[in-house]
């Protein structure tokens, strides 16, 4: 019966995703469905409600953090910080390195802002605009944008995904980042080589005519983005603060508050906003003034309510599943995979299955954690495994919002996922490394047994 209920839930999630229904509605329906299953199995409604609330309590801090991130992104837009970064880096997109530059610039933006969607809409849009006019197929550019946009989603100190993983595993984002950097170093280098190689093979902007046209498009793109903003090097202060405080491994609330507060001051001093306008932008998001680029609109607490609601509702599942033992069969299968191929393979399998069904990165992370919990006893390693699987695999599923939204923002087709090299290389590389390590461990155990 549990399998049938899970099948109905998966079908509802997939159908709602294809029909464009907000994810929160099938999630709410799933909560009632799972409560009904528990009641049919003889579990009390009050006991299940208590279990659900206890699991919600574990993500209480992250919900507040989501709101702080909304404030940060609004203030970075209002202060001109994002505009300034785009303005000074857009000139890198030229010639055969255009795909590599697109990937690297989106990596930089996503690391600083912690948002894949925001990166795709700002830096991704500009890079796609320049690349398309240079004759680069949007199919390839979309892969570079998608790859770079999720670089920061995985390892940024202000990433909601990283924070969710840390909360679920009982670890700390600042302490997790060094391990994430190490595990992604080789995939990152390989992705850079592939993007550079494709640019060279295509001969992007190789002739003089293309170079002249590309230079003109860069100027137009930068001018459109920067129009109406008073840009000075001071706009970099919020980004420098976030990076510096992250290196000191301070609490994420302190990092976010410092980044948002410094940007709010710049919005008033450099962009001429008043205090009520800043306060309103913190709540509803930044609304560009006449003459400013509409690409900068967004952010604010309101922008985070959707993902916060998804996390809030889906967090109840953990308590319900634990109370009703609904996932015991699936969990046993995942543990069998871990016993045969190692914990990373098990986490990757669970995360991939969740990503295909759930259509939501947040839900993939939470259910992937639920299914593979116990496969890796070390909390730090388990957090790293979730980062190397659930966080990036979600963006490779064409019908997932994690994939569809960034690609739609730059006008790229779903097939661009095949050229999102970084997102494929992170789980593939680490799977290979962990399989070798697991086999060596088994071999050593056999020798010791003799």
Language model features: what each stretch is:
Residues 144-145, 150-158, 188-208, 436-438, ...:
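Transmembrane-helix bundle segments that line or gate the permeation/cavity pathway
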